[in-house]
Amino acid sequence: MNADRPCCQFVTTKPTVENVTPFAQFQLTQPRLKGVSLQQLSALPILYGGGRNFLFGRFTDSEPQLQDTDLFVLDSCILLWPAHALRGLRIPYDAVIYHAVRRADVLELVLAVERDATLDSLFPPAPGPQPFALSTLELRLRPRYATYDRHYSGAVEQLFTFRDFGLNRGDAMVANCNTAIATCMEFHHRAAAADDDDDDDDGPAAHVTPLAELLAPAGHVPIYANHGSADDLTDDGLTDDGPQGGAAAGMALAFCSAARVPTKRRRQD
């Protein structure tokens, strides 16, 4: 396990219509500013996708133990919240190894996450040495209801509405969630790459190399004091302790006019 990356955590605040903003609503209500990311413009977490009534578990050879779970794909993390639970599982995007859509009996979402202490408490690893250096846990999310199944819920849906997420049931819900995870992981990796570039820019501006010593050996006093600002072509850049009586380097410029001189043309008989 990489000690530098964020780990999975348990959270006690469930996303609702009051503490998150669906991405479609955010686009309608917030102006876009050039050079400013969406995360900096929104005061609330942005909900890119998710859905209700997922069967959540892991791939096993025996009959899997699945439970009804809500999935929230936020701009900052992936959140799994089992039904009737008082806490949810927060998965940072840095911990996601891969995600995909798999066709089994029905379409299901596959999520491979790097193991840590939190995941080990929920899904204990197999005893014995691990065959790979990177220990991962493969989870699956399968919709309980198909796209056109009729079922009744005791609560009115206010977050995953048709206006913001379209037809978000069955296979369509799996595809929507997979696309939302891909979108969020893309700008997370892009932001991490930009941070790495900023760290590279903070490095030294000049490096001493053997080539520099070859061009300017020790004890050599240059005639021109070049500071890298194109000041080596002026007389002010000449040092006073240069060679006396020698040929001074210089530059001669000649400007010629291309205009023709008018002449009188003699007509021959």
Curated annotation (Swiss-Prot):
InterPro entries with a match to the protein in the record: ICln/Lot5/Saf5
Location of the protein in the cell: Cytoplasm; Nucleus
GO BP terms, alphabetized: mRNA cis splicing, via spliceosome; spliceosomal snRNP assembly
Keyword Cytoplasm part of the UniProt annotation: yes
Protein family membership: Belongs to the LOT5 family.
Record flagged with keyword Cytoplasm: yes
Origin species: Eremothecium gossypii (strain ATCC 10895 / CBS 109.51 / FGSC 9923 / NRRL Y-1056)
This protein's name: Protein LOT5
GO terms under cellular component: cytosol; pICln-Sm protein complex; spliceosomal complex
Key words of the record: Cytoplasm, Nucleus
